[in-house]
A protein has these predicted regions:
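Short, surface-exposed beta-strand/strand-loop-strand elements in extracellular ectodomains
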Residues: 41-61
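Residues that flank catalytic or metal-binding motifs in active/ligand-binding sites
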Residues: 30, 43, 85
Length: 118
């Protein structure tokens, strides 16, 4: 049975790339919405997907020079990005003088399992 999950992470005055959400073991996640909002400053914001099966990181979203004074944001709706167990969403601000909130909405459901009987 699937359930809706929203992961939220706010990064303030820090440009280090950090983990935002890890798909739990024996689950899959289907991303439907990505929302990135600047509440202070004027910097780039990046969202990444780390594929644990191939140990490869992919860029998912990039918001260039979001200005909090103008209420700028990036909204990607009606997506279908499938993640597998232990995949990781990561976020990174481009500088150290901003506050950016990242929100990702997804459906989380148990992974299909195959059993073999002798």
């Amino acid at each position: 049975m699937a359930r809706n999950v929203t992961a939220v992470k706010t990064r303030t005055n820090d440009s280090a790339k950090v983990d935002m959400y890890t798909v739990p073991a024996k689950n899959t996640a289907e991303i439907h919405m990505i929302y990135i909002l600047a509440s202070a400053g004027n910097e780039d914001a990046d969202l990444y997907w780390y594929d644990s099966a191939t140990t490869t990181e992919y860029p998912l979203a990039h918001a260039k020079a979001l200005q909090s004074t103008n209420g700028e944001y990036l909204l990607l709706n009606e997506l279908q990005i499938d993640l597998k167990e232990n995949d990781i969403l990561r976020v990174k601000n481009s500088g150290t003088s901003s506050s950016i909130t990242y929100m990702v909405s997804m459906n989380l459901k148990p992974a299909l399992a195959t059993q073999f009987h002798s």
